[in-house]
């Protein structure tokens, strides 16, 4: 489990984005919708 600070920062970033919601819609879903349109 030897992780560099960069690896941890990347994980934290992904975790934050995964939790981020806009009006109850997951950020991932918003991004997918924007790409589809």
From Swiss-Prot:
It comes from the Eukaryota. Gene3D superfamilies: 30s Ribosomal Protein S19, Chain A (3.30.860.10). The keyword Lipid metabolism does not apply. Belongs to the universal ribosomal protein uS19 family. The gene is RPS15. The keyword Ribonucleoprotein applies. Keywords: Ribonucleoprotein, Ribosomal protein. GO terms for cellular component: ribonucleoprotein complex; ribosome. This is Small ribosomal subunit protein uS19. One of its GO terms (molecular function) is structural constituent of ribosome. One of its GO terms (biological process) is translation. It comes from Helix lucorum.
């Amino acid at each position: 489990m030897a992780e560099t600070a960069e690896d941890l920062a990347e994980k934290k970033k992904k975790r934050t984005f995964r939790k981020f919601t806009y009006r109850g819609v997951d950020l991932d879903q918003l991004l997918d919708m924007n790409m589809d349109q």
